[in-house]
């Protein structure tokens, strides 16, 4: 008997796929389409187990849908721009382009060795001119619409990577790539007006029925829509006003001070003549701007000489520069009510600012102790003049009416989300296609001159971008007036590229951004990736899709119908990482056990949404199962050569039992496939093989039927072995283009059933009965059974409880 030689099987199968262009996909209106997509990887150079799991999930889905008769698009590409490649190139003294292309070639070969069914004819790399040309074109369209703009902005500055970070890219006060403490810095930045789409992005979350609730909740919170009042505080002895937004106007009469951001114009003006304030502002620049960090870091402030007038009471109120107020939120000022806001209370305690209680509890029994903490619940107004006695709802309306009539405030809908800063001060990215002219200002490059090519022959350093030092790149003529001008040297945030790549896969060679194929394939039917992308990539991609829709490029409102967020791969309870020394190299596993084993383990060890704990014994178990599958085929290959068909009238009792088990497991597997519960699909395969092995006298036709069902269920998981056996057993040419098995409902109709017999709730017998018996007939047979009679003779049968074809309980006394 032949041994399971996974190496030869996998090589020959991959060669078959290559020769036959098996995975190439074209538009076919006669079939239902299915677009399956896993998030494109950064080409780091080597695959890790997280990659293997993520892309195996996508491949299993794509193969299953293809076997369901659908026209499946399953593409792959590379998120190739960005700092990691630039930093690696500096370290290894190579150009980022050369480094990236070398990594892509190697990773592609690793993907192929795992048997992934990617249509490589649609491959894209975001660093290729043919790709980024069209995002430059799109940016120009957005600029013309006023959806892209440039302004000075206080940004998160990474002093190591020498670039700006979006708020989402700052983790615990540090740069997500470098780990450096982030600083605040004001520089000119390009932005996209995502705030113009905030309402629609929020509303359309309701359309995402097949997204995880956790992701939807994160996006809802990140967009952060809230209704409140903007209140105007007049600066004393000045014509200026400070506007603040509040969702709690019922606490307005309790304002004890205003807090302004360190970058607020009034703070900067006073700092010119106050060295202590200037030093405090410098200190604030070195602290985190992330909300999570602001909530936990020490509250610090500096009392200014500025005073404002309360809009209702006309009291004079102090203004403090506070490290917890962000210039990027609202007007960079907040009203502070220490008695009713915990953060304000902590600040007031530190600086001995008095408290004024203006809300009391609806519950008279509740004791409010402002010495211990703020009272933050809604209640009844007190110490609020004409508004005393009002509840929150009535106070909101009354104070809104007063402020509006006095021109001292107005109702506002506010969003937590802010416009997306898309420019980065690094080299390895897509050049922003803008030109700066002294006479004309910022002017877009002429569309016929696109793409603005990124120079590849550059001297890289760790300090910022070299583009500003390349005369032939930076010195250009103004597209409008023709005078000497300067090209923009900032490049796009890499999230710009990854926000539309899924659409370009539909028409990767089109001489336009998207063509009609986009509307055939979009939206993506199944999208697979990590939950860590919930509020960056997934939100930006939704935004981009709506921008493309409004440009007439796509017709759908949302890019991804169904989202699957896979769990991490752990070893010893921790995420695999070089620093922890717990990395498992997939290539070593492929060499030792074969790609099919690695794929099978990654799908069987845990449900896809949960973390997978690495286990060498689990891998060995997967390999052992595949050897059993191979050995069964070897032992029975003579049977398959006979071309046997199933004849139901010739089936034995044993055949019928086996077919019941096989088709029951097939039915469960189809249900679990559709729910993406792949671990239980693999379990069904194991049960079918056990069934085939456990019955000694199965008809040859049942063996053929059962094993062909097993191979087709297993094929999406272990495509090499199943392809090989399908051909070797003369079942067909290519299992991938074979229809998925259909449940035979006749096989699920049992001639007999096993009945559990209880007496007074205790198990006494198990009887095999004819499935055609009525309830009364079942009762008669059970009561007449000699073994059962031994328990009930000379006893009174009080009642008989029958659960059809499962259980009967005889109550006696």
UniProtKB/Swiss-Prot annotation:
**Residues reported to bind ATP:** 578
Q: Name one GO biological process term.
A: leucyl-tRNA aminoacylation
Q: Where in the cell is it found?
A: Cytoplasm
Reaction catalysed by this enzyme: tRNA(Leu) + L-leucine + ATP = L-leucyl-tRNA(Leu) + AMP + diphosphate
Q: Quick one: a GO cellular component term? A: cytosol
EC number(s) stated in the UniProt entry for this protein = 6.1.1.4
A Pfam match: tRNA-synt_1
What keyword terms does UniProt attach to this protein? Answer: Aminoacyl-tRNA synthetase, ATP-binding, Cytoplasm, Ligase, Nucleotide-binding, Protein biosynthesis
Q: What is its main location?
A: cytoplasm
Per UniProt, the short sequence motif 'KMSKS' region occupies residue numbers 575-579
Q: Which CDD domains match?
A: Anticodon_Ia_Leu_BEm, LeuRS_core
Q: Name one GO molecular function term.
A: leucine-tRNA ligase activity
Superkingdom, taxonomy of origin? Bacteria
Q: Give the family per the record.
A: Belongs to the class-I aminoacyl-tRNA synthetase family.
- What is the protein name for this chain? Leucine--tRNA ligase
* Gene that produces this protein: leuS
